[in-house]
Every structure is written in C-alpha cells, then in structure tokens.
Amino acid sequence: MKDARGLDVTTDDATAVAAADDFAARLLRLDQGVEAILDAAKRWPDTAIVQLYAATFWLYGQTDGALETAAVHLRACDALAMNTRERALHRALALWHGNDNLRAVEAMEAITTEWPSDLLTVKIAEFLYYVLGQQYMGPRFRAHMRRLEGAHAADPDFLAMTAFASELCSDYVAAEAVAERALGIEPRNPWAQHALSHVLIRQGRVAEGLTRLESFLPLLATCGRPIHCHDAWHLALLHLEELDVAAAMRVFRTHIWGITPDFVVEQLDAIALLWRIEMAAGPMDAQWPSIAEHIAPRALETFMPFMNAHYVYALARAGWTDAVEAALAGMRARSIAHDEEAMRVWAPVGRAVIEAAAAFGAGDRARAAALLDPVMPMMTSIGGSDAQDDLFRQTYLRSLQAAGRHADAAAYFDAITVGKSRTPLDRALAN
C-alpha cells in the first residue's frame, strides 16, 4: 500500500496506514494528538511503519526512560517485513537512539534524497540539526530544504521549516517572506510563527513581535504542548527585550512552567527564561527549588551539552551542590568517552560550556569567563538554535563584565548585537 504522500508501506491494512499518516501529519504540524501512535503500535504490532513512528515519538522525549521504550519498538521491527525505505528509516532511528547524531542525520538526508516525498523524515532531521546545533548546522539544513523545494513548494509545513533554515543562516528577508507564505496557506502553523518570531527578535522588532505572538496565543494553546511552551517562551523573550519582567513572568506562569514540568522542553524553556531575567534584571531565587526537583534526574543524563548546561545552572541556583557535582561528574565521564559524539562536541566544547554554566550559577563569573574564552567560537555546536544559544552569549558577556574585562566585554557586546535595533535589554546588558 501507499501512504498519504505516495510512499510505499509494508502493510495491507488501510486503517494502520491511516494511523501512520495521522501521526506524520500531527508531528509535521506540531499538533496535539501525536501520542495516538502509541495505541496504534499496540493495535498493529506487526506493522513496521507504525512501530517506527512509535519509536520516533519516544526518541523525541530525550530521557533515558523514553530511550528504553523507543528501543522496544526498534527491536520489534527486527522481526518484521520492511521495504527499503522502512529499513533505512529503522537504521537512521537506531543511530539516533545510540546518540550517533551526525550519522543519524546523514542517514535521514540519504532517505530524503531517494524519497523526496518523505517529509516526515525531513522533520526528524530538522530536530537532529537542533541536537547538533541548529545555527552551526544552518547551511546544511538550508541545503537540505533547497534540494526538496520542487516536491513541497506549496506545503505549509515544508515552508515553515524552510523559513527557519533561512533564519538560521541570517537570511532574515527570505525567512520572513517564506514564513508569511506558510501562514497565508495555513494560519494555524506554529512552526512558521516560530520562524517569524526568530526574525523579529534577531532584528529587534519588539513591538511588532509582541503584537504577532500575542495574537497567535489562542491558536497556540490548541497546538502540541512542546510548541505551545516554546513559542510562548519567544513571547516572554520579547517582553524581556523591553525589560518588562512582570509581563515575561505572566507568560512564564500561564504558558511555560508548571503545565507539564517533566517535559524536557518545558524544563529548558523555563530555565532559560529565568536565567536571562537574572542576567538582565536580578535574582529569581524563589523559582529555582521547584524546577530543581523536576530536573535533578535529567541532569545525570547526557543527550546533548546544551541540555546539561541548563540543568547545572538551575541546580546551582537552587543550591543543590551535591546534584551539581553529580551532574558534572557524569558530564566529565561522557566527555572522555571514545565515541564520535564525545570527540565531536563533548570534549572540545561541551565540557567547558557546562562547567562555565555551573560556575556562573554558583556566582564564580570570572571562572565562567575563563572557561568560555576558548570555546565560544564553537559554542553553537552544543545544540539549540541561534536564539537559544544567545543565552550563552549573554552569559559570556556578563562573565567578562564581572571579571573586570571591560574592553573585551564591550567588543563582544558590539559583535553580538550587530544589525539589531538596540532594545532596553541590550542597553541593560551593555552596562
């Protein structure tokens, strides 16, 4: 049989294919209901594409428990009939499961080369660009999208990804135009709105950004929880650009923290917002204990340095010294492993960024500056997007200032704000 995009799938059950199509459509749109694939996996244990999509669902979880469950679905496929594309996807997902992220994205790019209609695999690859560092991988991401334009030129989900790839390459004119086109085709498109929010923040178009994102909130609440949280985080950042901490915290309480506090995306967005507020406006001491309770187990896991840097900062701010030391010990062990991911990012960059985040959270900003000095040129390889990695740019700036390295700080501030209309936040960070 064929799925909704004309791709061959190994089953004769139209209902199973419909379940797989439903998952693909919802994940592409970042919609609610993707978890329905888990019931589908129980109903069709012998259908490979359903098991592969169930594994995909769990791999997005980025926790040890989620990985264990993903492995069950991947192992189930070993005994199932699969066509060539399904076997290729199985291999790519197994590489992702093994934290072999660069090889996983290479495998997914190969799939979309042979089967350009496979837009879901493009979406999964987009997430792996995030794991590998979206700004760092931006040119590669954009090349991937350009290769597929002929097959998906009018697809709003493809256009949303294309807009984001353009933004990551600092082509803000193209990013904005493509995001607006995607929203014109499908207004309920949180990823296109996300790409647009990146453009507006990067250019310092704060008033316009606030208007656009506020207007999108009612629709956003009907989308999947991760993008609801994350697009709301961008709204809070726009409030922070105006140093409106009260408004940013209203968004924090209503849309970001405390709804699904064990979700990784909610944890990272909550930590990042509070961390930025602390650098701009002052301590947020009361917020850290509740976050620490939820993240302490996660801090021992090592999926990508970007995550661990957030976790150790939050634990340090909560005063959980033993948890910080345990997390740092796990990170150090990860950084001296001999696998490709350890050698690609953990040892040369990730370890220093995580150590610096812990030092910064504990108040030792001079040490944070010294740790970050040699690795900032490669910082974007630790994971996250350009907007997310601005957190570490601001941390480095504040560390330089606290260390009394004022000339270095002034030069760095100018470098990271070039081309942006200066906002109240920028003026606060400059001092």
Name the predicted role of every residue range.
Residues D13-A19, P45-I49, M82-A88, W115-V122, ...:
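Generic helix N-cap/helix-start motif at coil->alpha-helix transitions
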Residues R26-L27, W58, L95, A125-L132, ...:
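Residue at a conserved register position within TPR or TPR-like alpha-solenoid repeats
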Residues G33-A40, A66-A79, L102-T112, Y136-G150, ...:
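Alpha-helical repeat scaffolds
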Residues L237-N431:
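Helix-coil-helix junctions within alpha-helical repeat/solenoid scaffolds
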